[in-house]
């Protein structure tokens, strides 16, 4: 007989947390305040992992998942929780990490940045596999806790134009002679363009190429092919096509990019996040500002648009070349860019860059610990805006900024970049 537990809270991955015979048990599919019948699928020394078999007393915040693949597909984990409650849970994750890891609390909690809950995702990496037992080729995300690919024909969080391609892609690849040599497809949607980058372990033959060209024409998409690393990606069809781009209309900017270059998956939240970052940073003419981990200039160019002299630093040579091109195309001579490995920052290297009035930091999940440890004791930037995709590393870096470098955590809040997932995007303001 399956045990019944009361769900006490949600963990940072969106699992229900219960106690069973004194042992912490993480319950997939259960919400705080619910009573659930569970089935344990893995026992560890200090905790159990379980699935909710039946919800005996549902939470008022429980929602009916919109996606028919929810529960099997691993792309989403929180569709069963009402959207506003998802955001509240992410805000709690941010606050708990700041308090527990960073030993800091923000003076102000910023209101969460919201956007569309469905059809928001313009970027995805779709796995491909021929599975005859499932009727042919599968294209989509992996199943939950599995290397298998979910049997899906659409996706509710992908942009509608991208979601509508999943079933046609399954049919296309099923007709190709090298279907077993296409492990994945990278999808990138701009404001008016969709690009599909096929990862190819062997090239298409003439018949395959004809099928792919016909598919691209019929579905109004561009097809690229990638033989090895991302740098090998190149256009396949059509020969002449408009470039990918996204806009930051508040600043009058158009940002072209290659499909293999990093951009945020959620364009609406990206616009809101850039707007908030600029309000918090408040760049002014004559100020000298650094944008670290600048990518293709997502924050750098809006800062330059406000008249500040801004130096963007990024470890990728390709992204810096793109950022320089974007600055030129948007007529922003106040934006300069350099290539440097910010994970190897030292106080000496930071001092050589010259003094900065303000700093914007937007690192990957690993954070920016070497940068914050390298800030000078005297003459440090008086204001830092930190954009984070991992609250744990933000909290770790905040501890150094506040307790070692003398900054105050003035404000922090979340941006719901990935609705229906446990991913927490956040932004924080530090001042001294």
Curated annotation (Swiss-Prot):
Its EC number is 2.1.1.190. Keywords: 4Fe-4S, Iron, Iron-sulfur, Metal-binding, Methyltransferase, rRNA processing, S-adenosyl-L-methionine, Transferase. Gene3D superfamilies: 2.40.50.1070, Nucleic acid-binding proteins, Vaccinia Virus protein VP39. S-adenosyl-L-methionine binds at residues 264, 293, 298, 314, 341, 362. The active site is at 389 (nucleophile). Residues 1-54 form the TRAM domain. It catalyses: uridine(1939) in 23S rRNA + S-adenosyl-L-methionine = 5-methyluridine(1939) in 23S rRNA + S-adenosyl-L-homocysteine + H(+). GO terms for molecular function: 4 iron, 4 sulfur cluster binding; iron ion binding; RNA binding; rRNA (uridine-C5-)-methyltransferase activity. InterPro entries: 23S_rRNA_MeTrfase_RlmD, MeTrfase_TrmA_AS, NA-bd_OB-fold, SAM-dependent_MTases_sf, TRAM_dom, U5_MeTrfase_fam. The keyword Iron-sulfur applies. One of its GO terms (biological process) is rRNA base methylation. [4Fe-4S] cluster binds at residues 67, 73, 76, 155. PANTHER family: 23S RRNA (URACIL(1939)-C(5))-METHYLTRANSFERASE RLMD, RNA M5U METHYLTRANSFERASE. Catalyzes the formation of 5-methyl-uridine at position 1939 (m5U1939) in 23S rRNA. Belongs to the class I-like SAM-binding methyltransferase superfamily. RNA M5U methyltransferase family. RlmD subfamily. NCBIfam families: PRK13168.1 (NF009639). This is 23S rRNA (uracil(1939)-C(5))-methyltransferase RlmD. It comes from Thiobacillus denitrificans (strain ATCC 25259 / T1).
